[in-house]
Amino acid sequence: KAFLRNLARGGAYQQDAPGLWDVTFQTAVAQAELESREYPGFYHKVAFRFEDGTPIYIETTRPELLAACTSLIANPNDERYKQYFGQYVYSPLFKVKVPILAHPAAEMDKGAGIAMCCTFGDVTDVEWWRDLKLPTRPIIQRNGRIVMDTPDWITDPAGREMFAATAGKTTFSARKIIVDALREAGDLDGEPTPTKRMTNFYEKG
């Protein structure tokens, strides 16, 4: 009865929203079941480009998520990027047009200070997605592999061909393919640099 009352006054509703999922155990995971561990990775300095080809660089440990990019985000107080808010750039390899936006959760001293928001790489992506009302562009299946079908938001023929090269691959295999392609296209600045970060893991994993 309590639920029906909530439903009648609009207090109960359905919503599409991201959840935590373990690809090994194939199960949903509660926040209480997460534990933070140090995890080694690599920063990749990647060029997004304005209409005239001028680059703007982000640094990411998850280049395999480039196809899921919805926007670039920097802190509203970051003088390096204030002039770019509201402008658009194109993602490397996939040539998807994305906006440059401001959000206070962007860390000025992390990487290049400007980050790509992908749906979804971490909880910060979820926060940005909700607050800025960004599109949802999932590319990873429940089994941890890249989806088989090329998404509709990738319209550039070369971009669709690039995505097809990663379809069905694990994120680790897709990462190598993407990094090699970025290097060949001239969109990877220098070589990846080692880093360590705290990452949430399922406590049983």
List each model region and its residues.
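Short, solvent-exposed coil/turn linker segments
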Residues: N75, G144, T166-T170, D187
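NTP-handling and nucleic-acid-processing catalytic cores
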Residues: K1-D149, W153
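Short, surface-exposed amphipathic charged segments that create phosphate/polyanion-binding patches used
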Residues: D152-T155, G205
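Short secondary-structure capping/junction motifs at helix and strand boundaries
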Residues: R9-P18, A185-K196
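Active-site cavity-forming subdomains of large catalytic enzyme subunits
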Residues: G144, I178, F201-K204
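A glycine-rich phosphate-binding loop feature that marks nucleotide/adenosyl-phosphate handling sites
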Residues: P18-A28, P194-G205
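The substrate-binding groove and active-site-proximal loops of carbohydrate-active enzymes
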Residues: I114-C118, A158-T170
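Phosphate/diphosphate-binding loops
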Residues: K169-T193
